[in-house]
Amino acid sequence: MAYTLPQLPYAYDALEPNIDAQTMEIHHTKHHQTYINNVNAALEGTEYADLPVEELVSKLKSLPENLQGPVRNNGGGHANHSLFWTVMSPNGGGEPKGEVAKAIDKDIGGFEKFKEAFTKAALSRFGSGWAWLSVTPDKKVVVESTANQDSPLFEGNTPILGLDVWEHAYYLKYQNRRPDYIGAFYNVVNWDEVERRYHAAIA
């Protein structure tokens, strides 16, 4: 069964003024859709076409060599963006509560230390990529970054929060001001969804 573009859980303009409607619409309907089209084309007629995309990308290193490039770039793009849309909300922002807050305190040293590390991961990623809060196989939370459309799933970690720092994610509004975009992202983080994903990752 072919992958399809997930519906956003809010309107394109819902994250204004932090992320503008034009960027959201182009990012969702053009960039994300292209990753889906390309991974569907690569997988057509293979035994992997019916796998959930997260399972597909987690198996990257065991896939046939001719599929590894398309899955890395386009399967990764689909998985990453599918998470990205859900971890933002017009009612987002603030600080995490519950178990994920406790995990951040224990493993990273508190919310301010997390913000410092996450901002650094997003700022220092040269070129295109992502910043992540992920859960390791031993159930610790870590901040990491990946290049291009690489996913923490490639290395066995489970992403629970991600920030897209490709220029297409922010350039229309922020031009080259990536720090401003990163700062705005904290205003829309959907910590309830991050908490849900944390519980799923440690289950």
Curated annotation (Swiss-Prot):
Q: Which InterPro entries match?
A: Mn/Fe_SOD, Mn/Fe_SOD_BS, Mn/Fe_SOD_C, Mn/Fe_SOD_N, Mn/Fe_SOD_N_sf, SOD_C_sf
Matching PROSITE patterns: SOD_MN
What cofactor does this one take? Mn(2+)
Q: Name one GO cellular component term.
A: cytoplasm
| Domain of life (superkingdom) | Bacteria
Q: Which UniProt keywords apply?
A: Manganese, Metal-binding, Oxidoreductase
Q: Which SUPFAM superfamilies is this protein grouped with?
A: Fe,Mn superoxide dismutase (SOD), C-terminal domain, Fe,Mn superoxide dismutase (SOD), N-terminal domain
Q: Where does Mn(2+) bind?
A: H27, H81, D164, H168
Q: Name one GO molecular function term.
A: metal ion binding
Q: Per the annotation, how and in what number is the cofactor bound?
A: Binds 1 Mn(2+) ion per subunit.
Q: Which catalytic reaction applies to this protein?
A: 2 superoxide + 2 H(+) = H2O2 + O2
**Listed EC numbers:** 1.15.1.1
Family designation = Belongs to the iron/manganese superoxide dismutase family.
Q: What does this protein do?
A: Destroys superoxide anion radicals which are normally produced within the cells and which are toxic to biological systems.
What name does UniProt use for this protein? Superoxide dismutase [Mn]
Organismal lineage: Bacteria, Pseudomonadati, Pseudomonadota, Gammaproteobacteria, Lysobacterales
> What is the primary gene name for this protein?
sodA
